[in-house]
Amino acid sequence: MKYDIIGDIHGCLQEFQNLTEKLGYNWSSGLPIHPDQRKLAFVGDITDRGPHSLRMIEIVWELVIHKKVAYYAPGNHCNKLYRFFLGRNVTIAHGLETTVAEYEALPSHKQNMIKEKFITLYEQSPLYHVLDEKRLLVCHAGIRQDYIGRQDKKVQTFVLYGDITGEKHADGSPVRRDWAKEYKGTTWIVYGHTPVKEPRFVNHTVNIDTGAVFGGKLTGLRYPEMETVSVPSSLPFVPEKFRPIS
C-alpha cells in the first residue's frame, strides 16, 4: 500500500485541497480519492486557527470512519476539542476559539452532527498508526522507539505533545527535547506538531508540519517514495512560530 501523509492542517481547507490535487487526488465526488488507491494519513491537528475547521472534521470523518480509505492520528488540538465536546472545562484559547466560533454559529442540529462525528473520529482512532508491516509509523508529535507498541498515559502525552520537559519558554510554550536526534529505530516515524520551514529529516524521522496556518506551507510525504510535496499557505507569515533549523 502507498500512502500520502499530510501535515498539520489546522482548518486550512483550501491548502488541503490544493495539496491533495497536486498529489493526484480527484475531488469530483466531494472527497479526495486517488485513482491508484493511494491512501491519505493525517498527523492530527486538523482544526483550530484556520478558517474551515468544521469542514475538515467532516472530510476526515468521511474518509476515515465512513469510507475507511484514510488514517488519522489525533493531535493535541484534537484532544482539546474532544474534551470541549465532552463538556469538560477547557480554556478556549490557542486556536480553539476559532473552531468554537464556527461551531456556535451553527444551528443546534448541525452542532450535534459535528460533535458526534468528531467524538466518533477521535474515539475510534488510535494514538498512532503502524503501517506497511511496521516500516512506517504515523503520529502527531513523534514517539520514542521504546514506546512503540504501547498505548499508556505516558505514551499518550508524548505522541500528543512531544518530549516535554515540564519547563516553559518565556512565551509560555513548553520546552521540548529533540527526541528525533536520539531515535535509532528503522521504522520511519512521520509526524508534525512543531512547525518547521522545511520538512525535517533526522535519522528515520520526518517532521512534515511546515506551518500552513502560520503562512508557511502545507506538506505531504509520499510513502514509500519518501518525497515531500508542498503548497504555499494563503495566510500571513508568522516567523516566530517556526522552530529554528538544527
From Swiss-Prot:
It is an enzyme of class 3 (hydrolase). Its cofactor is Ni(2+). Pfam families: Metallophos (PF00149). It catalyses: P(1),P(4)-bis(5'-guanosyl) tetraphosphate + H2O = GMP + GTP + 2 H(+). Its EC number is 3.6.1.17. GO terms for molecular function: bis(5'-nucleosyl)-tetraphosphatase (asymmetrical) activity; GTP binding; nickel cation binding; phosphatase activity. GO terms for cellular component: cytoplasm. It comes from the Bacteria. Gene3D superfamilies: 3.60.21.10. PANTHER family: BIS(5'-NUCLEOSYL)-TETRAPHOSPHATASE PRPE [ASYMMETRICAL] (PTHR42850:SF7), METALLOPHOSPHOESTERASE (PTHR42850). Asymmetrically hydrolyzes Ap4p to yield AMP and ATP. Belongs to the PrpE family. This is Bis(5'-nucleosyl)-tetraphosphatase PrpE [asymmetrical]. It comes from Bacillus thuringiensis subsp. konkukian (strain 97-27).
